[in-house]
């Protein structure tokens, strides 16, 4: 399981996306109700309790490995329990939120949208969120005996832009060749066979580039 976090200044677009009818199932709502538009408005009204908070929108998607698909496919209770544990460990409490699962992809995932201005007008801290998110996801993956979802291993290559596709090709090549290489020269030769040129820019690190005629 991995968690992807974003923040924003307005709830409208985020709530509409998360609750898009054809691909979404609302599992739980706290402090908000009604249509996506009404829910967004209720989020915005509470945010007025603290005008010092600019990024009022908290949004996390919890993404599970395809290997957990069969287990989570029809178990909304399990997914909701995982989301509850995630929120508690991240300090997302005493605030409005919605939890919805999406059914548009091969891997199970759910979205948590919450108000960073809590019910008392206090700010829900985002200090050290990145590290805390990683730690919490690892803890819950172990607790619920889930698989670690590697986002890069399930990328849809055909959807990538040329620059991102080039970076992804480098990632795949390194993943394949690094375990087999016994020296930098071995790695350089192996990458050259894939039309990837490796150049040393400093003693401590390398820079990898794809030639302009690379596919």
Region roles according to the model:
Residues 1-208, 214-215:
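N-terminal nicking endonuclease/strand-transfer module with a His-rich metal-binding environment
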């Amino acid at each position: 399981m991995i968690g992807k976090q974003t923040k924003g200044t307005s709830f409208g677009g985020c709530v509409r996306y998360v609750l898009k009818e054809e691909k979404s199932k609302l599992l739980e709502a706290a402090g908000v109700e009604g249509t996506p538009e009404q829910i967004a408005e209720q989020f915005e009204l509470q945010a007025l309790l603290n005008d010092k908070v600019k990024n009022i929108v908290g949004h996390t998607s919890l993404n599970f490995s395809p290997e957990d698909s069969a287990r989570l496919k029809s178990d909304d209770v399990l997914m909701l329990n995982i989301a509850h544990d995630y929120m508690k460990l991240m300090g997302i409490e005493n605030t409005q939120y919605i939890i919805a699962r999406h059914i548009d992809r091969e891997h199970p995932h759910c979205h948590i949208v919450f108000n960073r201005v809590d019910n008392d007008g206090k700010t829900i801290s985002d200090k050290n969120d990145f590290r805390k998110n990683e730690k919490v996801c690892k803890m819950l993956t172990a607790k619920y005996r889930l698989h670690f979802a590697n986002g890069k291993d399930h990328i849809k290559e055909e959807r990538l832009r040329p620059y991102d596709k080039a970076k992804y090709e480098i990632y795949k090549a390194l993943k394949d060749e690094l375990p087999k290489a016994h020296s930098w020269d071995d790695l350089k030769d192996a990458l050259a066979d894939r039309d990837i040129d490796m150049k040393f820019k400093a003693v401590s690190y390398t820079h990898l580039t794809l030639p302009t005629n690379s596919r």
